[in-house]
Amino acid sequence: MKKTMLTMGVAASLMLAACSGTDAESEAGSSGEEGGLSGTLDFYTSQPDTDATALVNAFNEQHPKVEVNVFRSGTEEVIGKVLAEEQAGDVQADVLLVADSVTFEGLKEQDLLEPYESEELDAIPEDFIDPDHTYAGTKVMATVLAVNTDKAEQLPDSWNALTDADSKDEAIMPSPLYSGAAAYNAGVFTRQDSFGWDFYQLLKDNGTSVVQGNGAALKAVQAGEKTYGMVVDYIVANAKAEGSPVDLVYPEEGVPVITEPIGMIKDTDNEEAAKAFIDFVLSEEGQKLASDLGYTPIRTGVEAPEGLKSIDEMNVLSAPLDELSSGREDDKREFKELFGE
């Protein structure tokens, strides 16, 4: 996978000014009392580069003396890096923001997260906050039906559109073996009485294609290779806004959602800056930025971008986190056996 390391933060002149004195405030991991927060902050994320850059730039407008180092990759590689560093006895990350709560539950079980009860949590729905305050969701990304409007006679309102005889060989979805969102979806769908593994068997029997990621699934729908796709909502809305012949449907049975949680790594070198960064992401300003980037904000009172539903408008499908976490590898094995991936 593509890996990038971006270094953002203060301009060279500010860094020189910060280093000109003998105060310890200029050292990495420090927080200056008079000049505000300072030092370095290592931010590990699975966000796209452009989103991570926009977030850090906005944070630095409030805290220009904090130099934010960003490591960006897919969720699996980000977590792999954290675990490798932990094994070596020195986790470099201060703040982590990756795909889903199941991933954070695993880190929590390994005692890698530091609890932090941000004041901004008052405006975040309780369902998306860890009761122990080791992580909280930052946005809402629902998996929806992507529909090619040139091929479909009308927009469906149910997930049954994927399993109807008329849709034979016309559906596509990302693989839980590669996509964190798809793995979460499999865990949620198979723990619903109205779906279960029978739903995935019907998908298989109806000729549903499987590709690695959401982007590839949407591309097939955009190109007219498939009529329907199981895809995260924001990329469908973006494609529609750009003129692609696609639309998105939130099926009446409900939708699984991932929330790209954020959390602080235990024994961070710059706790105050880490807390400030988390506060910013969850704040009204940070959530408006998420909306501007095309995501449904998780904070109440902040409008979703055009074409997407707000969290209050969604019928959310969910399952117990402990079951999703403990069952993820079994879910992947079951999927692999069923689809022959």
Model-flagged regions — what are they?
Residues 141-142, 201-204, 211, 242-266, ...:
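Periplasmic-binding protein-like
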Residues 15-18:
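C-terminal motif of bacterial Sec signal peptides marking the signal peptidase cleavage site
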